[in-house]
C-alpha cells in the first residue's frame, strides 16, 4: 500500500510539475536578441545606438513574422553563449556557424545563410595557399570559430594570431600585424576589399566551406537548450520570409549574390 501511495504521489507530483511547466511556458510575445555591434555588413551599431545590417534586418523580419516585440542586445562575441545561457537574451542572431561543439551548449535554427571562408592577403603575394606556402607566416583568424580550429589543425608550422571579432581579422591585417587573414569571404568582399584600407589586398587561394548547410552546418540562430517552442516559431518564420520574398529583399540590399545557400 505504501508503495502504491508513493507511486501515486509521484505521479501526481509529476503531473503537477508538468502542468506548472506548461502554464509557465513563454508565449514569446517578447524576445531579447543578442547581436554583435561591429561586423559590417552583417551588423553594426551607430553612435546613436541604432543597429543596422543583414543580421539585424533578418532578426527584425523574423520578429515581425511571429508578431513578437523584440529587443536587440549588444554583446561581445566571446560572451555570446554564456550570456545566452545566463538568460541575458533569448536567442543569438550574430552570423554564428552551426558546429557540433556549439550544439552541445545551445540549440540552433535552420541555417539562414551559408558562405565559404576566404584567405585575404596583399594582392599577388600567394599563388596558392597551403601549409608549405604559409610555413613561418602569421595567420590572423577569429578565435572560438570553425576557422580557428581549421587553421590550428592544418597549419602547424605557421604562427596564429587569434582575434576577438571577425572585423579584427582585416583590421590587424591592414595594420601589418599578420601576413594573411582567414575570414568570411562575403565580409571581405562586401566591406574590407572595397574600403581604402583594403585597396592593396585581395582574396587569394581557394575559398573553403567548413561544415556548410548541406552537412547540417551553415549559419544559424542560437537558442537555449530545450526552448523548442521558440525554435519552432523561428524556423517557421524563416521559411515564411524566404517564401514571401522578404529574405530576398534583405539579401539584395546588402549583397550581389544569393547567400541563402539552400
Model segments located where?
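Short helix-initiation/N-cap motifs at beta->coil->alpha
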Residues: 56-57, 71-82, 126-127, 161-177, ...
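Ligand-binding clefts/hinges and TM-proximal coupling segments of bilobed small-molecule sensing domains
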Residues: 69, 146-160, 200-202, 233-262
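Periplasmic-binding protein-like
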Residues: 113-121, 193-235, 257-262
Amino acid at each position: 500500500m505504501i508503495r502504491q501511495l508513493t507511486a501515486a504521489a509521484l505521479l501526481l507530483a509529476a503531473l503537477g510539475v508538468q502542468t506548472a511547466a506548461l502554464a509557465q511556458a513563454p508565449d514569446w510575445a517578447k524576445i531579447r536578441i543578442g547581436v554583435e555591434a561591429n561586423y559590417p555588413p552583417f551588423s553594426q551599431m551607430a553612435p546613436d545606438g541604432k543597429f543596422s545590417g543583414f543580421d539585424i534586418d533578418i532578426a527584425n523580419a523574423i520578429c515581425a513574422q511571429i508578431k513578437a516585440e523584440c529587443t536587440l542586445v549588444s554583446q561581445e562575441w566571446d560572451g555570446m553563449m554564456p550570456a545566452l545561457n545566463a538568460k541575458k537574451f533569448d536567442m543569438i542572431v550574430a552570423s554564428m556557424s552551426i558546429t557540433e561543439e556549439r550544439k552541445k551548449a545551445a540549440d540552433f535554427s535552420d541555417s539562414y545563410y551559408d558562405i565559404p571562408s576566404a584567405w585575404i592577403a596583399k594582392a599577388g603575394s600567394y599563388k596558392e595557399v597551403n601549409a608549405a606556402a604559409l610555413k613561418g607566416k602569421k595567420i590572423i583568424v577569429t578565435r572560438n570559430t570553425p576557422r580557428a580550429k581549421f587553421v590550428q589543425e592544418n597549419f602547424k608550422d605557421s604562427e596564429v594570431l587569434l582575434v576577438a571579432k571577425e572585423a579584427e581579422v582585416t583590421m590587424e591585417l591592414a595594420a601589418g600585424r599578420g601576413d594573411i587573414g582567414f575570414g568570411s569571404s562575403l565580409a571581405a568582399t562586401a566591406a574590407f576589399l572595397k574600403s581604402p584600407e583594403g585597396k592593396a589586398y585581395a582574396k587569394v587561394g581557394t575559398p573553403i566551406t567548413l561544415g556548410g548547410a548541406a552537412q547540417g552546418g551553415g549559419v544559424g540562430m542560437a537558442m537555449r537548450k530545450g526552448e523548442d517552442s521558440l525554435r519552432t516559431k523561428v524556423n517557421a518564420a524563416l521559411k515564411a520570409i524566404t517564401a514571401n520574398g522578404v529574405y530576398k529583399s534583405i539579401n539584395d540590399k546588402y549583397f550581389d549574390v544569393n547567400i541563402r545557400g539552400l
